[in-house]
Every structure is written in C-alpha cells, then in structure tokens.
Amino acid sequence: MLRQSYLPIFDLINLNLYLTLKQNKMKKIMKHKFQYMLLLLLAIPCHSFAGEKSHVADSENLLLNKSLQQSVTIKGNVTDAAGEPLIGVSVLVKGTTNGTITDFDGNFSLSAQKGDILEISYIGYATQSVTITNNQPLKIVLKEDTKVLDEVVVTALGIKREQKALSYNVQQVKNDAFNTVKEANFMSALVGKVAGVTINSSSTGAGGAARVIMRGSKSITKDNNALYVIDGIPMFNANAGGASDSRYSTQAGSDGVADLNPDDIESINMLTGPSAAALYGNAAANGVVLINTKKGNVERTSLTVTNNTTFSDVYMMPEMQNRYGNMEGAFESWGGTTTKRYDPKKFFNTGSNVINTISFSTGTKKNQTYASASTTHSTGIIPNNSYSRYNFSIRNTANFLNDKLTLDLSANYIIQNDKNMTSQGEYFNPIPALYLFPRNDNFDEIQLYERYSVGRDLMVQYWPYDAQGMSLQNPYWIANRMNRTTKKNRYMISGGLTYKIADWVNVVGRVKVDNSDYRMQQKRYASTLGTFAGANGFYSDMTRTDRNIYADVMVNIDKRIKDFSINANIGASIKDLVYEQMGGEGDLAGIPNFFTVRNLNYSSNFKPKQFGYHDQSQSIFANLEVGWKSQVYLTLTGRNDWESMLAYTDTPSFFYPSVGLSVVLSEMFKLPEFMSYAVSYTHLRAHET
C-alpha cells in the first residue's frame, strides 16, 4: 500500500516512472540525515515573521468559552496497524493553526484545551479525530487508506479524473499552504512548495505581480507565465503596469490573479505538463494553475474571522567598497580612504502586510451559500510604496429536479489601489542613485530631499550632484515626488448549469464576465530632471478597460463496461476580449505642481493616447480516456481554435492533439521479492503533445 508521497525517480522527455519507498526500511538511514538537516535549518536567520488569529463561530459547537479554559500539554504516540511508529504525522487542533508533527519514534506533544479535537493525518492513511478529555497520553493507531490511489483530482476544464489514470503530473496545494503566512499576492506564498514550478515575486513592492514558470522557460522573448483557471473557467490575467524590464520603465503593476482573496480559495492544482493543458490550447502552453474556490457548508453554519499580519525587512544588501572615497565636490570614489561611511540600508523601511477577512458559510443538502469580505493593506520596504485591496464575494450552489439539475452562481467585486510600485528600470527607480551615492559623503543630508527656492517660490529638489550621465536624482525625491498610482475596480460574475441526463452522462454549460476599469496617473513635481518633466512638472492621466467574456458547453460521459472504463468529454467554447485605453500626458503649463488635464502644456510635449483591440476565439475540444481493470489507461485529446486575428490568413485555425498512457505496474505484476522490501507502488506515465 501507499506509505508516502510519490518520489520521482526519473523524467526523460515525456516518460515518468514513480516509485514509492516503504518508510520503515528507510527509517534508520533517514534519521541521521534528518537530524543534520534540522541543525542546519536552526542555524538559518529569520528575516520576517507573521502572526495569525482566527476565530470561528460554529452553529454546532461554539468555542467562545475556550479562552477561559486552562491549556494542558497533550502527549501521544502514533503507529500503524503493525505497531511501527510513524514519522512526520500531522497533529492539528481542529479549527486552529496550532499543531505539530511526530518525531522518529512517533511521539508528539502540544498545548491544547479540554474539549479540543485533534486531527491526525498522514499520507496513505485515513485521517483520525480524537477529542481531548484529559491530559493522559494518547495511543493512536492509523489505518491505511486504500482510497489514496483512487483519489479524484480536478484537471483541465474542471473535469474530475482518478489521479492514477493521468498520463501527466498534477500537484495539489491545499489552502493552508498559502494561508499560514499570507501575502498580498497569494501566489508569492507558494514559493518553493510545488516541485518543478518556479515562482518569482517581482521587486515592484507591496502587491506586485508573481511570475509562475513550470518546468523552465519555454521562450526567450515571449511570456512564460502559466494560465490561471478559476473553477474551470480561464481568467484574464492582465498586468496594469508597463514593461518592468526596461531602463525606461515607469509604472509597474500587479496582475489579475493578485486580486483574489486567498481565504476564498479551497485548493490549487498545478498542471505542469503540456499534455495536461492540451484542452486549453496555446494559452496553456506554459502550464495551468487551477484555482478551486470555496462553496457553502452542508447542514452546517459557520462564521469565520481571521487576521494575518506580516512584517518584512531588507534581506540582503550589496557589499560596498570602503577603501576609496570621493574627492571634495566629486561623485566618483577614486580618492583617499573613506573617513565616514553611509549605510544604504537606512533608506529602506520595514514593510507590513495586514489581511482581515470575515466569511460566512451555510447550507442544506439542496442549497449552499458562501460569502466573504476582506481587506488587505500593505506598505513596502521602499518609502511611499503602498497597496490596498477590498474583496467582496458570494457563491451559491443549488440543486433542483431531484438533484438532476445543479445551478452554481458566483460574483466577486474588487477595489484595488496601489502607489509607487517600483519598476526595474533605471530612471524611475531610486535604487541606482542610492547604491552609487559617494561613499565619503553625508547621506543624511539628502534625506531633506526638497528645499524652498526663493526665486521660484516653491519647494525644489535637493541633489548636490548632476545627473552623472545616468539621469540620477535624489532617491528620496524619486520615491516621494515622482508618484505613480493605479486605481482599479473589477467585477467577475459567473454561472454554471449542470444537467444529469443519466447516471453516466451529463451536460454542463458555463459563462463568465470579467471586467476591470483602471485609472493610472503619474505626477512628477517641478524641478524633476528635465528629461522627465518640464519646468513646472509633468502629468499623465490614463483610463483603461479590460472586458473578457467566456462561455462553454460540454457533454461528459463516465461509463464502465465489465473490465473497461470510458471517460469522454466533448464541447465547444468562445472567448471574447476587448481592451481599450485612452488619455493624455505632458508637461504642466502655467501653474507648477497643479496636476490637472487643463493645466497641461498643449503646445509642447503633449501626447494624447488612444489604443485598444478586440479579439475573439472559438474552439471545439474532445477528450477520451479508456481504462482497463483500473491498471492501464489510454487518453486521447484534441482541440481546434479559430482566432479572429487569423481570420484572413492561410492558417485560420490551429489543432492541438495529445496522447497519453498511464500504467500502474504494481497492480499488474507482483514485484520481485527483493524489490518488495523497499518498493510498494510503481507507476509508468508517457505522453506526447
């Protein structure tokens, strides 16, 4: 039986072989390695910390009186049915983040209160719940879970499949993986938690975009980001900011997936292989992130209030040379030994991220409702960088006609504001001037970044150096007087209807409207370097609308005939995307620092802007999986897309086929005796896309 998670042995082109090692045979070897690794982990300094408080009111068991009870230390031991201790078993107080894991001898210890319920879970074993009645040691025996190998996972287009039937890799991430320590963009909390997936958080500051790359970059010049799919429907993941990898970059931004409230997410599935994404066409060439949101409870009502507060600091600074200083009035450090040194770390702040959420869940067997409201407020480590978001969501699922008809409706509304997300460019980024500041000069002096000018009768930038051929300015001026803001209002409305024709066939129809309205402004104050603003300043005011409409219909078949199983899906979809941007920018005219469109200098350096596009794609797709004795599975998929941008070309459409094979070798053949001591499960996968 399955004792641990699958261990990848090799992955050559499109061939995967998975072996599961028996724990007890490896225990002595791993014990010493684990102790050494633990010692190393304890030596690593921590540069951030977080705290979370969660209060849950349940209609069946109100826990309000728990704070009045005295905590006790609960000790116990966890073994399997043969009496062998289990290592790394999760022991968690239900409804809280208070938990621990068992040691090498299966022992655990944690503080809890009488009446608390302990949930004991381990991969390959059935989860067990124990109610604490006293502080006597617990003896817990976990039973092997034979259902693990037959676990059902959500795949492309929301299709549910047995995990062992898949010819590609699917990794599931539960809610607690990104909700224990929350980020303004929840994808950033998944860094290092999914094998084969690289997640890079941008350096734009609080609320910045996250880049998800599965199994390496596929292109040097094109987008390598994965496709995001919410409850089976693709999401438009636009970035409101300009390019962030150019020296001329001005306004970075967040991405569409960052708008989601992590507390509304039940789980995330990562489809890392191209075959896994074949049903989505070229949009999923880089992999798919399937996001499954929460539904209402059945026969249970709960109210949950959570707070998560995180602080962040600069992790690392570049090493500065202190052997050479600068001469009086010079910028370059080619002089004598420095007599005083500045620390650029003084420029940075301590960042913070505060997320508050209240959610309500209730329902019956016929109707379930989930609703939530959330606020996110973040400040970055760079001065004057902030991000705020307000999320409101509701989802209702109802069954009709003796459960043959299911209606699933959801709505989300997001208000987002960000300020001074820092681009990676050279000109609108305070970091170059900060790091190049002369080592021998007084850095504290430039903290007063503006001083009163009698001649101009206004505050002007203080920077006792010229631009040095690199358009350098006072870093504090860039952070406080070259402001960039984005205001965003977004709504997502979706509906799904499923009709069960028979036990083995159903029809599904879904539609989603995703609309985002932006207002993006830039304000550069008078005395900003002339390359970037006129004598009286610079102003840019742009509005933008993204509207994405998606709809599909699909027939699903799940039939078993003697030793054979047949799963088939056939359907069609349409996606309609409209993008519009309009506004203007230019130097200010008569009144310095008066940022209105009427004060723009229309006779010099004024640039009206208006652009956009309308794109539509229509698709048909099909999937066929044939299984034999739950041991061998053959999967065929195909999708054809008709793109509006290719309507009058020689190739108006594209076809995406794939074939996959999955063989559970350990169920087909009895393993040799010499292998059975260490291997309990073998699985062969192959696919071609």
Feature names for model-found ranges:
Residues E688-T689:
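Positively charged, low-complexity/disordered segments
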Residues I265, N367-S372, D466-L472, F594-L600, ...:
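Active-site-adjacent bridging/hinge elements
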Residues Y648-S653:
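Short glycine/threonine-rich loop-to-helix capping motif typified by GTGT followed
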Residues L2-I414, M492-I493, H614:
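Short, small/polar-rich motifs associated with maturation and membrane association
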Residues N185, A209, N286, N353-T357, ...:
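Transmembrane beta-barrel architecture of outer-membrane proteins
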Residues V148, N224-N225, I230, F236, ...:
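Surface-exposed loop/interface segments of Gram-negative outer-membrane beta-barrel transport/assembly proteins
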Residues T293, I358-T362, I394-A398, I493-Y499, ...:
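Residues on the lipid-exposed face of transmembrane beta-strands in outer-membrane beta-barrel proteins
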